[in-house]
């Protein structure tokens, strides 16, 4: 069953199989930290590197990417841990902690938790705003239609004539930059609906400007499924307009009336066609604290176990994760925020820095499967021996060529430049 944020903070045990909440979901981080400090919840953190919650965790258990399921199984079956898990409600905070590994490893670790605590609840943590609402509304692969990577592969193969980017910037978000470049080069018509001009839509055939948050009315759905209203505060710039208006006028131009002429019509259409949004039928229910969506049917975790290959002793297993401030368009476009984005660097344990034979701040050559980048290296006590951490989407060096979206894990060689 799914947990709410309140249920998570009231749990006796909070198990973290998630990214660094302090960096990616700072408000949730504050709630969980408060639960550990004042409500006596005990945090059991499984992490490939130290996070912002590590100082507040009852137990922090490290693992090398690809081996978390085994570590979770061995940890939770100890006598001490079984006693703690039996003290009350257990909630698992689950998200993708590493962009350089197959997400199935995290799901396998979650399955191991259920094997020990069948009645545990789960709080799925999705980083981007309103992703939960988009998933509930059906913006996920249907009937084997393929996900974003499948669409890009089809475009790169010349099988898609018109590609529409609905608020998407694959050049910045997709790890395989080469795939995106080939896909955008092959499509005959590229249409973008976005608030900003970005690296993906800069050469688009058509860009339809969409109003940003604060420039339109509507609702948003947070990671726990809580629907709340958003209110227009300023007038959209230039000819920008809410995206639902763009969709309505496009449908009319194409000879199809979707039956939406106001925000009220749109909300009614949503709640009548998507049962999960039924509690938000009354617009007033989304004011204040909002209203929780109807809980979805529980899902089953299945599939063949995937095992990561062992790491060569000369290599370092890569950890790639996001930070609070990166080169996201809204950050780059803000004069007060753009200056706090850090340059790209690779972080290793101080003892590994000596093993590589370099001093902190010097440039090193980082290689993976025939691809090399030159990047500054820094020491970090929170990075485990034998692993290397790369913050994603920072300024300077583009680290995406090192990533393999088809692989289970990424191992890199770090060498001094002679």
Region locations from a protein language model:
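Generic alpha-helical structural element
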Residues: 17, 21, 61-64, 95-102, ...
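A cross-kingdom feature strongest in bacterial/archaeal respiratory oxidoreductases
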Residues: 3-5, 10-16, 22-52, 56, ...
